A protein has these predicted regions:
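Long, low-complexity N-terminal extensions
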Residues: 1-142
Length: 142
């Protein structure tokens, strides 16, 4: 956003994820009487590490180790709360994500029928290929 760019120009450094989350929460809160009916997930890495925030329509900002949103989120949370642990490898994290989303798709018709996945780390944003997701699904089904 323009506010983030302005911050970077003024301070000569990138805005932290916590500050970006607060900025977005303030924008959402400013529209509280005519809100954007969305729930946003804001995640990434900064000088303090990796972070993910859930932002609601009223401007609430909640940090956690993992976040989910949408109609299938209760099913996704069930899997994540059972299987998530600190310092998962990238491969383990992808498998856990596919397992959690597969559970939601099986139990919630509004969750759709397909998985899109990305990895956000210190190297940037990378989309996980459909072939890799299919390969993970196959190993989980076995």
């Amino acid at each position: 956003s323009a506010e983030v760019k302005l911050y970077e120009l003024k301070h000569g450094t990138q805005m932290s994820l916590k500050a970006a989350s607060t900025l977005m929460a303030n924008i959402m809160n400013g529209r509280r009487y005519m809100p954007f009916w969305v729930q946003l997930l804001l995640g990434g890495t900064d000088s303090e590490g990796s972070h993910i925030y859930s932002l609601d329509a009223a401007g609430g900002s909640i940090p956690d180790q993992f976040q989910t949103t949408g109609s299938g989120s209760p099913f996704v949370y069930g899997v994540l709360e059972d299987r998530f642990r600190e310092n998962l490898s990238l491969t383990e994290g992808k498998k856990l994500g596919v397992r959690a989303l597969t559970a939601a798709m099986k139990r919630d018709s509004a969750s759709g029928d397909g998985i899109s996945m990305c990895v956000i780390d210190s190297k940037g944003f990378q989309k996980v290929s459909p072939e890799e997701i299919e390969k993970i699904e196959t190993t989980l089904a076995a």
